[in-house]
Amino acid sequence: MQTPVSVNEKKDFIRWFLNHYQLKRRECVWILNYLMSHDSLMEKVHFVEQAEFCPRGIIMSTHCVDEVPFRFYKENVMTTDAEKSFHDIRLNKQQDLFIQLNFRSAYSSPEYAAVLESNPHLPKDLFENKQDQGMAEKILEHAISTFQREKLLKDIDEALDRHDKETFEKLSRQLNQLT
């Protein structure tokens, strides 16, 4: 599950997310667009759960959920001021930034599962039941695998439609490696 997520995968996910959901605070859209426009920043972005445990974390929520609209955590300080967080992001480009997105169907979204990383800053005693944690990781791995397979099949179909033999063969090899 700890396969690094590429900058392009993160950008594709943000584009998909912004096209399908409306964030409660417009500043969140500005922050995500700013991050997307700088590859060096995107390398430092990690989509996680429970970002409040991270040294530098942002929580953003959409209109379709009953969660806080926006929170920025830095060390032990929390603010709801999006402009302060934007300023911090610009000034500290070399620091990792952990983003938690709260939106409807987040846990059943293969798009989100494909970029979601394990939060390395979670307290060790947070999970009471190791069996539940293991089951959750297996479900997430299955969702990621299913998403990757479906995306490859779609891309293979498009390559066939274009009569692009080289791309078809490349994607077919990738699909065979998945299975």
Swiss-Prot record:
Signal peptide (UniProt feature, chain positions): none
InterPro entries: IDEAL_dom (IPR014957), UPF0302 (IPR011188), UPF0302_N (IPR014963), UPF0302_N_sf (IPR038091), Virus_scaffolding_prot_C (IPR027393)
Recorded superkingdom: Bacteria
Family that this chain belongs to: Belongs to the UPF0302 family.
NCBIfam families xref list: PRK03636.1 (NF002965)
Record's protein name: UPF0302 protein RBAM_020740
Organism per entry: Bacillus velezensis (strain DSM 23117 / BGSC 10A6 / LMG 26770 / FZB42) (Bacillus amyloliquefaciens subsp. plantarum)
